[in-house]
């Protein structure tokens, strides 16, 4: 897995090497396409993106070049253009049934073979496994959820535009704390959490604590674990006075910025009860 900077570097090398088939493992299509667009502008290569909602478009100009929204139609258009022009790159965002040997995967396989001969590249954004015979024609790269550094940029992009229109009490340390809390969420999830907090018309230091509670609304129960909602009066658990005393003593360490030591503070304490 890779953060955005590492992902961009790896993808840049693959584009320059004209790898015929690139599979991108990510659940965040928008972040992947954002990076692809940056690379298209930086190295000045033609890149086209196919989606079920817009058909095939030029990623730089956003101009539609083929209005056929079906995957088969998009592949036909890509293969036709790759056979006529060299060094073209096509990105497909929604291709299903590629895990096994079937009509879709073989259609894609044929397109990649054409790309090999013409210096083209077909890129696939997916979270699924890929038919092994197809995968062997290319390479795979993955994009992680935003880390703290990238999340800090996301937080500032969401909050700072409202600096003059609503009361904002956050300082640099508060932005960093919010980024640490929201790290490893998807970008859209973090933006939704922040938008929900700002919807009340202000952003105070107390809202930092509310970010953790807002995250609970994004996640359902994990298999084997059940989230139990309790009120503050029920937090007194017998036999844990020693733990509470230790946590009070270690509070500064648990909430400090430990990036210089390549450590991150714990997110909480998990109490496990054993029946009997």
Where in the sequence are the language-model features?
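AAA+ P-loop ATPase motor domain of ring mechanoenzymes
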Residues: 2-28, 53-62, 139-140, 144-145, ...
């Amino acid at each position: 897995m890779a953060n955005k900077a590492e992902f961009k570097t790896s993808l840049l090398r693959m584009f320059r090497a004209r790898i015929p088939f690139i599979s991108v493992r990510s659940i965040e299509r928008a972040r992947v396409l954002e990076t692809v667009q940056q690379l298209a502008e930086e190295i000045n290569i033609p890149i086209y993106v196919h989606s079920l909602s817009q058909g095939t478009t030029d990623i730089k100009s956003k101009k539609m070049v083929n209005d056929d929204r079906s995957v088969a139609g998009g592949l036909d258009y890509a293969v036709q253009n790759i056979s006529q022009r060299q060094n073209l790159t096509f990105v497909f965002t929604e291709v299903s049934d590629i895990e096994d040997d079937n009509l879709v995967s073989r259609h894609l396989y044929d397109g990649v073979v054409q790309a090999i001969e013409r210096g083209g590249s077909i890129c696939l954004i997916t979270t699924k496994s890929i038919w092994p015979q197809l995968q062997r024609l290319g390479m795979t790269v993955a994009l992680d959820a935003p880390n703290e550094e990238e999340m800090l940029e996301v937080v500032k992009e969401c909050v700072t535009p409202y600096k003059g229109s609503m009361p904002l009490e956050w300082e640099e340390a508060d932005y960093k704390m919010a980024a640490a809390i929201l790290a490893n969420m998807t970008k859209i999830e973090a933006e939704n959490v922040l938008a929900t907090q700002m919807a009340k018309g202000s952003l105070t230091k107390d809202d930092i604590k509310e970010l953790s509670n807002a995250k609970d609304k994004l996640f359902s129960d994990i298999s084997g674990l059940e989230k139990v909602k309790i009120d503050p009066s029920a937090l007194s658990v017998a036999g844990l006075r020693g733990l509470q005393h230790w946590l009070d003593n270690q509070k500064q360490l648990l909430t400090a910025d430990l990036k210089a030591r390549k450590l991150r503070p714990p997110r909480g304490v998990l109490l496990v009860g054993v029946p009997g």
